[in-house]
UniProtKB/Swiss-Prot annotation:
NCBIfam families: pckA, PRK09344.1-2, PRK09344.1-3, PRK09344.1-4. The keyword Cell inner membrane does not apply. This is Phosphoenolpyruvate carboxykinase (ATP). Keywords: ATP-binding, Cytoplasm, Decarboxylase, Gluconeogenesis, Lyase, Manganese, Metal-binding, Nucleotide-binding. InterPro entries: PEP_carboxykinase_ATP, PEP_carboxykinase_C, PEP_carboxykinase_N, PEPCK_ATP_CS. GO terms for cellular component: cytosol. Mn(2+) binds at residues 201, 220, 257. Transmembrane segments: none annotated. Its main location: cytoplasm. Substrate binds at residues 61, 195, 201, 323.
Length: 537
């Protein structure tokens, strides 16, 4: 077996059980991975130097094909209400079949860190069949220096083989596509899909399992820090604006998707960004556009002009879930340490497909826990397989697919941290205004940015607020530079009776969804629920 590249020879591929390989390319950087991806026909170049790959059949995550080993430990520590299980025996069969499938291959290996805080990071080794997948995960996680690579001993190992086809009867899974995690052995197996996001979310899921035991709250959020050292975190599902809104030229970016919150503040799990880039433009998102238009960026399912090879970010013919992966250092004001102090503001982003939520609302601590556990948003087209237009969804903790533990674990941690550090909490609607999806229009990003700026710099505290009659939270009545009508959603609807009926419908959906949490929360959190009676007064 031919092995090339810097690595710890005492802990090579054979330690993972990989045998009879043709070779392993260890810790190759972007230029080498570009060469292999292009030579192997995996990807093409854009005119700006980005590496462009298609993911084929799977253009999003497949949460129904994700499985966790149920053993004596996970039997009681896992949230089985939101996760699917396989037996240890089924996982072992799958693992051995992965190893057999890899024989004769040349694999790409990356040794990386999940987590910017050395006290809580997990040493992660990723074997990939495709060179562009190796570049993707190298871009998304954090990269050790050469000395660390020479002594690197992995704690978590991923093997990613898109050409592998699972057998549901043999492996206990649902289809030929599979993501399987064994927390006891710290192994992740990914097969049957070329969608690279499965790798990063598998590392995230692993950190979500282990970090609460260490007193760290793992979060599906972006984070940035202002000139006064004021940290803000932004919760939200894919497509709700985490990446876009945290990329603010006036604030330092900590990260766009995954963070931990512990005794020393906030830290990024990653070393790169993974931005949705449908309709990406230099006017609306200049930093993300520039980062996606250069050497080192990886574009997924983005259509290129046949002649000029310029990306057409408006073309969603392959999927609405087009993506750009790029290193954090491509953002001019990104933090290279990936760490910041205790948050002063928590922002919960919701893409309200009903168009009845205000563009911003201030939450009490009890309301913050209520809306965190509710995780209301809309599934945005293309983020998951089979979703072609927004659908209302309650995804607890704004990340249900990535929660290995019961949501109350994360909810209680959030409430304690908010109280301890006297954090201001906000709910921001980046979804629809002027009507339900299909009738109204998307909330203007300029309005969202203006309101967020005022919230984060403290000026929004000094304006007059009203109590929303449906949801009970505090809504500003005016802000300089923002049309006052847009702050009160009913004023943006032509049909006021339709607004009332739609708002009541959504209130009922909140109440129905939260019923499963009522026994696990205090009375003040239950009282923070939207109330139809309140709306009737």
């Amino acid at each position: 077996m031919q092995e090339t590249g810097v690595h710890n020879g005492a802990h090579g591929a054979d330690k993972f059980g990989l045998k009879n390989l043709k070779g392993v390319y260890w810790n190759f950087a972007a230029p080498q991975l570009y060469e292999h991806a292009l030579k192997n026909g995996e990807a093409v170049l854009s005119a700006d130097g980005a590496l462009c790959a298609d993911t084929g059949e799977f253009t999003g995550r497949s949460p129904k094909d994700k499985f966790t080993v149920r053993d004596a430990t996970t039997e009681t520590t896992m949230w089985w209400g939101g996760n699917q299980s396989i037996t240890a025996e089924q996982f072992e069969t799958l693992y051995q079949d992965f190893l057999k499938h890899a024989e004769g291959m040349t694999l790409f290996a990356q040794d990386l860190y999940g987590g910017a805080d050395p006290s809580f990071q997990i040493k992660t080794r990723v074997f990939t069949e495709l060179a562009w997948h190796s570049l993707f995960i190298r871009t998304l996680l954090r990269r050790p220096d050469r000395a660390a690579l020479e002594s690197f001993v992995p704690e978590l190992t991923l093997i990613d083989l898109p050409s592998f086809r699972a057998d549901p009867k043999r492996h206990g899974c649902r289809s030929e596509n599979v993501v399987a995690i064994d927390f006891a052995r710290k192994i992740v197996l990914i097969g049957g899909t070329q969608y690279a996001g499965e790798m990063k979310k598998s590392v995230f899921t692993t950190l979500n399992y282990y970090l609460p035991e260490k007193g760290v709250m793992p979060m599906h959020c972006s984070a940035n820090v202002g000139p006064q050292g004021d940290t803000a975190i932004f919760f939200g599902l894919s497509g709700t604006g985490k990446t876009t809104l945290s990329a603010d030229p006036n604030r330092t970016l900590i990260g766009d998707d995954e963070h931990g919150w512990g005794k020393d503040g906030v830290f990024n799990f990653e070393g790169g960004c993974y931005a949705k880039c449908i309709k990406l433009s230099p006017e609306a998102e200049p930093e993300i556009f520039a980062a996606s238009s250069r050497f080192g960026a990886v574009l997924e399912n983005v259509v290129l002009d046949e002649i000029t090879r310029k990306p057409d970010f408006d073309d969603g013919s392959k999927t609405e879930n087009t993506r750009s992966a790029y290193p954090l250092e491509s953002i001019p004001n990104a933090s290279l340490t990936g760490r910041a102090g205790q948050p002063k503001n928590v922002v919960m982003l919701a893409a309200d497909a009903f168009g009845v939520m205000p563009p911003i609302a201030k939450l009490t601590p009890a309301q913050a826990m209520y809306h965190f556990l509710s995780g209301y948003t809309a599934k945005v087209a293309g983020t998951e397989r089979g979703v072609t237009e927004p659908e209302p969804e309650f995804s607890t903790c704004f990340g249900s697919p990535f929660l290995p533990r019961d949501p109350s674990v994360y909810g209680n941690m959030l409430r304690e941290l908010i109280a301890k550090h006297d954090v201001d909490c906000w709910l921001v609607n980046t979804g629809w205004t002027g009507g339900i999806y299909g009738t109204g229009h998307r909330m203007p990003i300029k309005v969202t940015r203006a309101l967020l700026t005022a919230a984060l710099d403290g000026s929004l505290r000094n304006v007059e607020f009203r109590t929303d009659p449906y949801f009970g939270f505090a809504v500003p009545t005016s802000l300089h530079g923002v049309p006052s009508d847009i702050l009160d959603p009913v004023k943006t609807w032509a049909d006021k009776a339709a607004f009332d009926a739609t708002a009541r419908k959504l209130v009922g959906m909140f109440q129905k969804n939260f019923a499963k949490f009522e026994a696990q929360v205090d009375a003040d959190v239950r009282a923070a629920a939207p109330d139809v009676k309140m709306a009737a007064e």
